[in-house]
A protein has these predicted regions:
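Substrate-binding/catalytic cleft of secreted carbohydrate-active enzymes
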Residues: 1-168
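Surface beta-strand/loop "capping" patches
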Residues: 166-176
Length: 176
């Protein structure tokens, strides 16, 4: 999934339109992109929704709004185990939480994954899920001799490190 990154608020239409176009032109041929996400954490601008189809004319990938039932997908973040089961029992949309496990701050992205996976994978409405966050966010600091600054425990700690080295969460997830 390729996300029009933001935080709580969506971009205004002028800025959002420019960013959608740039993102799709940059990533349209990337083999791992199966969905476009118009925002994150509740922030999106519905006026930019049509631009995803306009710029992705060839593959016409789905565009989603995280945390929402939108475009035939239920992408709610961080559902509990039983919430997911209820969505299968009572729902009719494909369920694919755009964030459902948390590896940040090395909270063990694989902790509890087997329980979710064993139950959820038995239902045809389940299409998988996304773990936050893939890699450590550690900018290279030119003012500090080129060190990778992860701000101690205040920066996201992902499944892999800032140099893509495998961390504990990687092995826990891989074992699932």
């Amino acid at each position: 999934m390729d996300e029009l990154a933001g935080w709580q608020n969506g971009y205004d239409s002028k800025v959002g339109a420019k960013l959608v176009k740039e993102m799709i032109e940059r990533d349209v041929n990337h083999p791992c992109i199966i969905l476009w996400s118009n925002g994150n954490e509740g922030g999106w601008n519905t006026q930019t929704d049509p631009l995803f189809a306009q710029y992705d004319r060839l593959q016409k990938r789905h565009m989603v709004h995280p945390w929402a039932d939108f475009n035939d997908l239920d992408t709610h973040h961080y559902p509990t185990y039983l919430t997911g089961v209820a969505r299968f029992t009572n729902g009719y949309k494909v369920f694919m939480p755009t964030e459902f496990m948390h590896a940040m701050y090395d909270q063990g992205g694989g902790a509890g994954l087997r329980d979710f996976w064993d139950r959820w994978c038995t239902n045809p409405l389940f299409a998988g899920g996304f773990i936050w966050v893939y890699c450590d966010e550690a900018p290279k600091r030119s003012d500090k001799g080129g060190i990778l600054d992860s701000d101690k425990s205040n920066a996201p700690d992902g499944v892999v490190g800032p140099r893509r080295e495998k961390e504990g969460s990687y092995y826990a997830i891989r074992a699932q």
